[in-house]
Swiss-Prot record:
GO terms for biological process: mitochondrial electron transport, ubiquinol to cytochrome c. Its main location: mitochondrion. It holds the Pfam family Cytochrome_B. A ubiquinone binds at H201. It comes from Lepus tolai (Tolai hare). PANTHER family: CYTOCHROME B (PTHR19271:SF16). GO terms for cellular component: mitochondrial inner membrane; respiratory chain complex III. Belongs to the cytochrome b family. Binds 2 heme b groups non-covalently. This is Cytochrome b.
Amino acid sequence: MTNIRKTHPLLKIVNHSLIDLPAPSNISAWWNFGSLLGLCLMIQVLTGLFLAMHYTSDTATAFSSVTHICRDVNYGWLIRYLHANGASMFFICLYMHVGRGIYYGSYTYLETWNIGIILLFTVMATAFMGYVLPWGQMSFWGATVITNLLSAIPYIGTTLVEWIWGGFSVDKATLTRFFAFHFILPFIIAALVMIHLLFLHETGSNNPSGIPSDSDKIPFHPYYTIKDLLGFLMLILLLMLLVLFSPDLLGDPDNYTPANPLNTPPHIKPEWYFLFAYAILRSIPNKLGGVLALVMSILILAIIPLLHMSKQRSMMFRPISQVLFWILVADLLTLTWIGGQPVEHPFITIGQVASILYFSIILILMPLASLIENKILKW
C-alpha cells in the first residue's frame, strides 16, 4: 500500500513542500530565514488574535485597553510584548532573507523575487498600521507624519490623505480603519507566502555556489526539518530574552504617553526597522523628492535582477562584489543610526552621503564590479 502522505490530495501538497522535497545538499544557515519568517508570521497572527480579543479601536479607549491587556489579562503583558518584539524579529529575519537573496543571486528567480518584494511592502504596511494602534504619542504623530507624505503626490495628494484619514486629521475613523487593515493584512501575507513558495518550488532552491544542484539533492526531511527546528529554537530563545528581560529596549518611551494632538514630541521617529528608509526620506530637502526616494529605497530591489552583469550567479567567488555588498550593509546600518538622530549638523550631511552611497552601490558600483570581475575571469 502506498503511503497516505503520497496519495491524499492535501497531504500530498505538504509532502511535496516539506517532506520529499529535493533540496540542495549545501545550503547554509542563510537559507533558514525563510522558515523563520514563517514562524514569525505564525507567532504574530496568534499573539495578534489574542490581543484583538481585548483591544478596542476607539480613540477614547485604545490606550487604556492596551494598559488593561498588560495589567489585567492573564499573561496579557507576555502576549503584548511577544507581539511587539515579534515584529522586530520578523524584520531582522526579513532583512537577512533579502540580503541572502542579493548576495547569492537568488533574485534570478524573477517570480519568487517579485512576490517577495510585494510581501516586503505588505509587511511594512502592516507593521506601520500596527504601531498606530496603541494610540500613544508616537503612534499618533507617526501616523500623522507618514500619511501626510501622500500629500506630496501632485493634484490628488491632499484629497487622498483626507480620504485615508476619514476626516481632516488622524482621528477615530483613522484608528478604526487601521485596526481593520492591520487585522486583514496578515492573512493576505499568508496567501502571498503560499504563492511565493509555489514559485520557489517551480525552480527549486538556489545554493551558496550559485551552480545548479540537480545532480546533488537530498530530501528536505529529516535533514532540513531538523535544521529549521534548530533555527526555530534560536529565534524563540532570542525573542524570549528580549521579551522577558528588556521588552521596551526597541520601543519608544514616548508611546507610553497617550496621544495628544496639541503636543508634538521633540523627535518623531518610526520603529528601528524603518529608520533607514526614514533617513533617506529626510536627507532630501524636497517633499515629493523625499517620498520618491523613500519608495525607491525598497522598490530598487525590483531593478536588481536587471543590473546583474556577472557571469556568475552567486557572490561566493566574486571578491570585489563581496566588498561592495558589505559596504552596502554598513551603509544601511549607518542610515538606521541617522534615522534615529535629530535633524542637525553633522547628522544631515552623514545621512545625505549615506543615501547617495546606498543608491550608487546598487545602481552603479555593483554592476561595474561585475563587469570588472568578468574581465578578471579571462586573465
